[in-house]
Structure formats: C-alpha cells, structure tokens
C-alpha cells in the first residue's frame, strides 16, 4: 500500500494543474459536506441524552380543526397519573413570570426560570453537581440552579442550602446545582423552582377542579411504563376532555382531544403551534442533506471527467505495466490509491475552509459551532465515511476504464474510447450542469422570495415604532402611570399596550355566531388584546 501511495504522489506531483483543479473541487465538496454533517448530526441529536428518552412523551391539546397546543388543562395530567396504569410519572412545568427576578447586591437580574413538579428529574436526565435529584423539588421555595448561575452569585463555594432572594422578599433554598443545560435540549432553563412554590404563591388555589378545564397554561410530560402500547393508550385518552368537561366545552363551542408527542419529535416534527422551546423542521434537515449530496456528486463527477479525459496520457503507463506483468487488479489499486491520496489531501484543505467558514455558517444556520465541535466522535466517524465514499465514487470508474487498456492496442496507438464510455461521460457532464443550474436557480428563487417578503405591506407603519417588553414591570406597578410617563417624553408621539407583538397572536380560540352553537359554525381565531390607542399608534 505504501508503494502505491508513493507512486500516486509522484503522479499527482507530475500533473500539477490536474491535481490542483481536482484538489480544489474535492476540498470544496468535502468542506460543504462536513459542515452539513455537523449541522445534521447536531439537529438529530436533540434530547437524545435523557436516559428514558424512548418513554418520554409530551401531552398535547389537539384541536380537530387545527392549531394544536402544547399547553393543557390542569386536571388532565392528574387524571392520567391516577387512572391509567400505563403512565409511570407525570410532571407539570410552567414559565415563571419575568417579575420574579433575582435580587443581588441591590440589583435585579432576570433569568430563564420554570416551575416544575417534584418528579421532573425522575423523567429527565440532567447532571447534578450538588443535591439530590429525588428531593430537589419536593418542597415549597426550593430552587435548582445551573452552574453558570452558581458561579455568578456564589463563585466556587458549595451552595447547597444557601438562600437566593427573588422579588425582594421571597427567599428560596438552593436544593441543587446542575450542569448548564446542553444546547441539544428543547427544554432550556437557568433556574427551576418547585411547583409547590407556585401553589404557595397562589395561596394554595387548586386548578384540578372544574375551573381547571378552562386554564390551558401548563405543560405536561409523562413517562410511560416499559412495553406500553402507545397507539392504544392514545386511543384511550383521546376523548378525555369531552368525557370529563364536555358540557362546559360544548357551551363554549370548543372541542379538544388529548394527544401524545414523543420526545424525539418535539424539536423537528412537533405538531404544536405554540412551542416554547427551540424548534426546527425535519424538512430543513432533508434539504441541507440533499445539498451536501449534490455538491459531493458534483465534485466526484468533476474528478471522473478530468481523470478519464486524461486517459490518453496514462494509456502508455498502463500498457507498460501490463507488459512487465502487472495485473488489472494491481493497476486498479494504483489508480484507487491516487484517488484516496487526493481525497485525503482535499480533506486537509477542506478542514481549513471549514474553519474559515464557521462564523458565516453559524450566522446562516443560527448555531454556535467552533473547531471543537468537529472533534465529536460522530463527526470524525462521518468524515471517515465521507472520505471512503468520495474515494470510491471518484476513483472506481476511472480505475476500471484506465486499467482496461490492452498493451497491443497501446503500442499500435488504437486507444479509442467505446461508445458506451463516451455516452457515460456526456451524461455525467449533463448531470453536472443540471445540478449546478438547479442549485443556482434555487438560490435566486430564495433571494427573490426574501425580497418579496421584505417589500410587502405589513398593514402597519413599522418605521419609528419601538416595542418595549413591560412584563418586567413589577405586578404592583401602575401601567397607566407608566404610559403617562412615556407619553410625556418629547420624542414620543403615541403609546399603546397589547399582549402580543404585531402580526403574532396573543391568544387562540374558537368563536361561534350568536344562536348558532355547533361545530359547523365555529371559527378558529387568533386574536390579541389591545388598548384604545393601538390602531392610531401603528
């Protein structure tokens, strides 16, 4: 093998122009493929680190007419836990309002915080640095923090049992410290406080009664027992809403079903329209994977065409090798060695291109990759597979063609390419131009669509409009006073409040025309609450 590589190196060095063109083409193809491999591997790895990942499901509220929600009525999870033996664990989660900020050295700091039931860490697997996952959320005013939060407020000291003050007067006992939440998790938080804290803050008010069927503001995850037949369970729980609260829902012209969404589907295949965590689309994964395949094919076809175009230059070499006793298999191995060596050299050049391209790629894909990301075992393994595939695709056909020359034909100068070979090369060239044209056309189409969206009338004047998130205003603050204070500024012409951004729904619901209660008259609606100045302000 070493001898093959030495001869391959000499041949590549001898034909420098050919080598540089192929090297650059393969390097560009491999760099694109490695970047997309990094992206696809990362996308498909989300939520895979949980020990019980295959048994974790998220509850969905299914609207038969569309607009499924990942938030549920409060009693649903309790009923599932108590009445369905297939369900091993149930957990409630809910976003903590921004007003519940950390008070530290006279300043307020807002963090991404959630309420969670005491079984949260029995369902999800997060690495504990301090504390016991089984009891960390079992009492009111317990809080679990990430390593970054601990370092920010306490440095390197042990913090288990220490007090963290929120909203000026609420004292929380630190019951656990966990590693920072991995990027490969759809659940992202910095602090997690017990759900019993929420019950204390609402004076022990229970939403598990009749009123809870109208409160769709809690997210639930369930852990199923091993061996559970999920389709059968879904069929059993589908009608839970209508069975338990049908009268009320019919009166409100609503119809909901209970659905289950596997943890593995939440990020890429979610059926929810109001997701709170990072979400993407499996279609984007397929799209970029297709681009990687096409770019690699272009590089390989370019290599094949250039190599076979030089067949006349290598024919004498092949003839002489056969005269001195080399077999066709040996000659094929020599040409495959050249393809392998060129691919490996292209990989090193491609690695430089990848390093230089990472900032742009991160900006384009909304990621935060660095060189260390390329050292993941899956990326290394995938890259080795890519090298093998490129070597086979680009080297095998030229090796077969070139090793097929007969010494007698070479000595006589009869080195004619068969009609089949000519047809194949022409087909490869046509395919190469077709793929290139398709990618260019797709690029211009996307640019055209983006320009079209940017130029469309939004229905309001977005210039000189500033949006402030006033959910951070303490609960006892006067919004009227705040509005008046802003209005007094000389640079402010008009002020308005709403519960959502322009163009985004604040709420979703179903409405019916008066005196026509019934599903056939229901209208799915997205709506928002605004004040009397809203239209004039926009």
Which ranges hold each PLM region?
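Membrane-proximal extracellular/periplasmic loop immediately following the first transmembrane helix
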Residues: 37-99, 209-221, 234-236, 257-268, ...
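Generic structural signal for small/hydrophobic residues in well-ordered secondary structure
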Residues: 12, 22, 43, 59, ...
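Bacterial inner-membrane juxtamembrane interface segments
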Residues: 17-38, 53-68, 82, 86, ...
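N-terminal membrane-entry
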Residues: 276-295, 377-378, 382
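Hydrophobic alpha-helical membrane-associated segments
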Residues: 28-35, 292-298, 345-353, 389-394, ...
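Alpha-helical transmembrane segments of integral membrane proteins
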Residues: 1-20, 274-277, 307-344, 356-476
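Mid-to-C-terminal secondary-structure elements
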Residues: 117-129, 143-283, 481-538
């Amino acid at each position: 093998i070493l001898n093959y590589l030495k001869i391959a190196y000499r041949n590549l060095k001898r034909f420098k122009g050919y080598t540089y063109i192929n090297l650059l083409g393969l390097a560009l193809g491999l760099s694109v493929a490695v970047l997309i491999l990094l992206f696809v591997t990362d996308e498909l790895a989300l939520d895979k680190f949980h020990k019980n990942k295959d048994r974790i499901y998220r509850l969905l509220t299914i609207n038969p007419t569309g607009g499924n929600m990942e938030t549920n009525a409060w009693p649903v999870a309790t009923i599932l836990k108590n009445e369905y033996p297939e369900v091993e664990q149930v957990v409630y989660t809910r976003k903590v309002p921004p007003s519940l900020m950390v008070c530290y050295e006279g300043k307020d700091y807002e963090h991404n915080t959630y309420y969670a039931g005491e079984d949260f860490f029995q369902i999800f697997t997060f690495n504990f640095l301090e504390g016991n996952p089984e009891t960390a959320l079992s009492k009111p005013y317990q809080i679990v923090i990430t390593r970054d939060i601990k370092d920010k407020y306490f440095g390197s000291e042990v913090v288990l049992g220490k007090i963290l003050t929120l909203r000026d007067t609420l004292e929380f006992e630190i019951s656990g410290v966990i590693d920072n939440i991995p990027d490969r998790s759809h659940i992202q938080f910095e602090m997690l406080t017990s759900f019993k804290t929420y019950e204390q803050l609402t004076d022990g008010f229970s939403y598990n009664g009749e009123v809870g069927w109208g409160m769709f503001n809690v997210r639930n995850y369930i852990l199923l027992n091993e061996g559970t037949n999920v389709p059968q369970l879904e069929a059993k729980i589908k009608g839970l809403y209508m069975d338990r609260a049908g009268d009320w829902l019919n009166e409100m012209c609503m119809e909901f079903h209970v659905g289950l969404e596997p943890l593995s589907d939440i990020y890429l295949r979610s059926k929810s329209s109001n997701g709170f965590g990072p979400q993407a689309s499996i279609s984007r994964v397929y799209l970029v994977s297709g681009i990687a395949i096409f770019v690699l094919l272009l590089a390989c076809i370019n290599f094949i065409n250039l190599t076979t175009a030089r067949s006349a230059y290598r024919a004498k070499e092949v003839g002489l090798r056969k005269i001195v006793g080399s077999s066709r298999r040996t000659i094929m191995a020599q040409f495959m060695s050249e393809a392998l060596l060129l691919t490996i050299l292209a990989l090193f050049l491609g690695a430089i291109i990848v390093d230089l391209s990472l900032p742009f790629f991160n900006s384009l894909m909304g990621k935060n990759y660095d060189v260390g990301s390329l050292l993941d075992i899956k990326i290394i393994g995938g890259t080795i597979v890519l090298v093998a595939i490129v070597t086979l695709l680009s080297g095998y056909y030229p090796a077969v063609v070139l090793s097929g020359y007969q010494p007698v034909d070479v000595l006589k100068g009869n080195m004619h390419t068969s009609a089949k070979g000519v047809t194949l090369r022409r087909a490869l060239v046509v395919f190469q131009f077709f793929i290139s044209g398709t990618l260019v056309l797709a690029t211009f189409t996307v640019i055209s669509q983006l320009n079209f969206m940017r130029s469309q009338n939004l229905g309001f004047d977005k210039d000189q409009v500033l949006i402030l998130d006033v959910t951070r205003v303490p609960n006892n603050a006067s919004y009227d006073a705040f509005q008046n204070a802003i209005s007094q500024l000389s640079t402010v012409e008009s002020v308005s409040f709403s519960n959502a951004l322009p163009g985004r729904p604040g709420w979703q619901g179903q409405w019916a025309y008066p005196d026509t209660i019934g599903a056939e008259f229901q209208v799915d609606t997205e709506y928002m609450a605004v004040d009397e100045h809203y239209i004039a302000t926009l």
